[in-house]
Amino acid sequence: MPLVRYRKVAILGYRSVGKTSLAHQFVEGEFLEGYDPTVENTYSKTVTLGKDEFHLHLVDTAGQDEYSILPYSLIIGVHGYVLVYSVNSLRSFQIVKNLYQKLHEGHGKTRLSVLLVGNKADLSPEREVQAVEGKKLAESWGAMFMESSARDNQLTQDVFIKVIQEIARVENSYGRQDRRCYLM
């Protein structure tokens, strides 16, 4: 019988970058056409990786900006983060830098389990952020990077598989993440 591990993952980013679309595509297997701003939603899905099962609890947040204050509910008890920007919005890329800084400070400047995602790769002709810029930013954080398209279901499953792998990588390099001390 496989070991079941619970993982809480917060999805953060500027408004209209496709956070809800990524989560919905992953869990429900369909793209949401209309845009209805999210206040906060949760999604759950169980994923099997190797011999282990992971019960993912996804927290789909409202769009943040540089003035947003991250609540402690997005710091305490969260195992990993998917920071999302839109490849056709330089502003969303700048906001994701601020969000990472706030998370980093909220966690006491310890290493975080973060996956940086350039979403809306299907809008590449309107691109304002090159993939190399996303990769460079993620490397500066010691994080993983990928691009995806919730609309085309391009690498949507991989986003959440990679964040599970990133959580394991960080836990293995620093010991169990849930043993950390949180500063409030």
UniProtKB/Swiss-Prot annotation:
The gene is Rhebl1. A lipid is attached at C181 (S-farnesyl cysteine). GTP binds at residues 16-21, 32-38, 63, 119-122, 149-150. Binds GTP and exhibits intrinsic GTPase activity. May activate NF-kappa-B-mediated gene transcription. Promotes signal transduction through MTOR, activates RPS6KB1, and is a downstream target of the small GTPase-activating proteins TSC1 and TSC2. Interacts with MTOR. This is GTPase RhebL1. SUPFAM superfamilies: P-loop containing nucleoside triphosphate hydrolases. A motif (Effector region) lies at residues 35-43. Mg(2+) binds at T38. Coiled coil: none annotated. GO terms for molecular function: GTP binding; GTPase activity; metal ion binding. One of its GO terms (biological process) is TOR signaling. One of its GO terms (cellular component) is cytoplasm. It is an enzyme of class 3 (hydrolase).
